[in-house]
Amino acid sequence: MAEEPKGVPLSELSLQQLGELQKNCEQELNFFQESFNALKGLLTRNEKSISALDDVKIATAGHTALIPLSESLYIRAELSDPSKHLVEIGTGYFVELDREKAKAIFDRKKEHITKQVETVEGILKEKRRTRAYISDAFQTKVQSQLATMNTQ
């Protein structure tokens, strides 16, 4: 059987090694924070899509509306068939669906993104805890070296 890998106690690392470890941990923390923010943005966009489906539900054929092409660019368009919705199912892939199927896709996306948010949230908590341990070890090491220098 393979043995479980053993870590090196933080107290045995030099100041330089602790500094590098702290820097790496900070970079990882920033990466996961950016991922978390991006996922929250996706969740918000998905919620807006679900809300838009509800808004179109009450519309009739010939209804005029502003359609978003991007977050800041809208065009005026006429709704030809309020029962059909164009839904992005992948990068650059769209499919025309009825309201129930479109809502089901958005609900699945919401569920998937929510799970990803929860996963990244857990990783962020762990990374913050690790950063605190490393920071404490670094401070302890600095104080220890200062005390050693003062006694000499």
Swiss-Prot record:
Keywords: Chaperone. The keyword Methyltransferase does not apply. It holds the Pfam family Prefoldin. Signal peptide: none annotated. Transmembrane segments: none annotated. GO terms for molecular function: unfolded protein binding. One of its GO terms (cellular component) is prefoldin complex. Coiled coil: none annotated. GO terms for biological process: protein folding; RNA polymerase I assembly; RNA polymerase II core complex assembly; RNA polymerase III assembly. Heterohexamer of two PFD-alpha type and four PFD-beta type subunits. Belongs to the prefoldin subunit alpha family. Binds specifically to cytosolic chaperonin (c-CPN) and transfers target proteins to it. Binds to nascent polypeptide chain and promotes folding in an environment in which there are many competing pathways for nonnative proteins. This is Probable prefoldin subunit 5. It comes from Caenorhabditis elegans. The gene is pfd-5.
